[in-house]
């Protein structure tokens, strides 16, 4: 039963079920995609978790992660949770004062820094973040001459963990079994637009629930691919890049760098893609440029068939059945033109395409719909563990953000504020009972207008 599941338990299940037979993670390094199986994923998490344990990490402790999307971010997050602790997300572009506040407020005692830039931030804050015991660096490039005793390196912590695993081979699994659905697995900080950021406590139950409910609406398979490039500190990326892949055992792919995201999307051809409006707008712009730069014959064909796609988009949006002739013409347009365009941009295999964080212009929605790509708007909040309201594939209405996920109760107050209830509603704000009491009165007060 899913009510007893946790992310650590899902990781263990996937490793036992798939072992080395299926890829769980890919990362592009030096131009080559490097693969990690489910067994490898499990071993990395085990090694880092036991390494943290050997440093003194105890149940309820926190690990902060500041860095770009890399497998080590997943390993650190799951390792903390396997030990009964929580991960704290820090955006890689956060300023020093933001980093200082989050580390201190969350009581993080270990910080995993993705690279030299992130490590330098934390080292600069040593005197004002006295609780931090170790700064664990993933990529030590440029840090050869650093000799601060607070520094440690990711691979060295994993090595310590492997040594402990050999001495106590059952310890890690015993720790996984001890993790409970009500355990806080993540403290995710709000933007702080109405004051200081508040730390939302997300439980294992919340994480599994949002993955389960998402999958009830948009089913995924274990052979699906996802490209992870939005910050781990954003709850939307947590849902699509951490919780859902663990729940359905599909692969997560990490781009080589921020500048190669679109190129790497083309290479992978994901089945699931979550992107903010700016990314969809950029792809749309690139499609239009490609059409304009095509040889005159192709450009002529594009110009003749694009109206066919737009007409089909109108039928879809107005929920009208197109005539058979129009439907056949649409298939011809897709086979001759749109499929090759989608393939060039890595969109051919897309089954579930999402946008969130801000509204996407209706003209962008319609352009992709004309090409056969159904982008769905999603609404959620940190306090609801990401999306709770989402478009359905067969019910996309540009004037709305969709309908609630199954088992999610949504109401509005007399003033139009949205209220939400369900298993995905967070436990409360860390060290802020007053704000928690204001937010949760049977239902979650989202502060958003319905």
Where are the model-predicted features located?
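AMP-dependent adenylate-forming
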Residues: 11-36, 143
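Conserved pre-ATP/AMP-binding loop-to-beta segment of ANL
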Residues: 19, 152, 162-189, 196, ...
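Conserved AMP-binding/adenylate-forming core of the ANL superfamily
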Residues: 24-78, 95-100, 153-158, 204
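ANL superfamily adenylate-forming
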Residues: 30, 117-180, 287-340
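Conserved AMP-binding A3 loop
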Residues: 35-39, 177, 185-211
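Conserved small/polar residues in nucleotide/adenosyl-binding loops
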Residues: 190, 445-450
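Conserved AMP-binding/adenylation subdomain of ANL enzymes
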Residues: 208-228, 232-331, 335-338, 349
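Conserved AMP-binding/adenylate-forming
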Residues: 329, 333-447
